[in-house]
Amino acid sequence: IHGNAEALKAVLRKEPDYDFLVFLGDSVLSGPQPKETAEILLDVKPDINIMGNHDEILLDHLLIDEWPEDWRAYNQWAFKQIPSEIIEITKTYSFSDKYEIGGVKFFLHHGQLDRSIPAAIPYADTSSFEALDPGNDCELVLFGHNHIQFTHELGSKTYINPGSVGQPRCGRTHACYAVFEDGKYIPRQVTYDQRPWISALDKIDDLRQYPKFTSWLKEGFLAGYGIGKREPWIRFHEEGYF
């Protein structure tokens, strides 16, 4: 979600009736609507929460000590906006585990791997996917982190990334998510108004001394390239990924 309340609201409007809600991590950081996003999450209360790397930062601010100054300022501002309740709930998030939902067994993982292992994205080696769930026998593995909506078949297993609600990277401006209906996986996307996100970013006084950084954030967000228009995201855009 990455602190994008507008995208989250759009998903919930499109899917008002659900039996079970799974969140795969990265809730309120790094985005300009951390408080609003936190309040929505406190209201909807996902049934399962998986710990993302940005959720870890929320619990341990020292993890950003070596980040660039502008990114540190962005996150330090966000830390001050977040309700204590969401911090306490974040402490209960799981890193990864097996779950049975509606009679279907899943292995859930945020998707962050050791830096020595290439990211689990389309065309990645088998080893990247196997690193997500070593020793696990679940045939369905759900993960996030890489902000691209895709599935990967490996033997009897299906690896599923439902994409990013709040920070797409493949040159599209949709909020991405997925549903399971009657045991069938359905990837979905929904458009939303980007202006409130931009307005929220413009109101962050702590970033006024970093105009190039805020311009870069806006350009990437409006173009659907959350971390910049570059490979492999340009290729993924051309191939139709969300």
List each model region and its residues:
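Active-site-proximal segments of metal-dependent phosphoesterases and phosphodiesterases across multiple
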Residues: 66-73, 104-135, 168
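Core catalytic region of metal-dependent phosphoesterases/phosphodiesterases
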Residues: 3-87, 91
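Conserved hydrophobic/aromatic beta-strand scaffold that supports enzyme active sites
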Residues: 96-98, 108, 151, 177-179
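Short active-site segment of divalent metal-dependent hydrolases/proteases
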Residues: 3, 29, 113, 148, ...
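Beta-strand-turn-beta hairpins that frame and shape the catalytic cleft
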Residues: 98-107, 154-158
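Acidic, His/Gly-rich catalytic cores of divalent-metal-dependent hydrolytic chemistry
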Residues: 153-242
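Active-site neighborhood of phospho(di)ester-bond hydrolases with catalytic His/Asp-centered motifs
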Residues: 21-26, 48-53, 109, 140-147, ...
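Anionic-ligand binding region
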Residues: 126-160, 165, 175
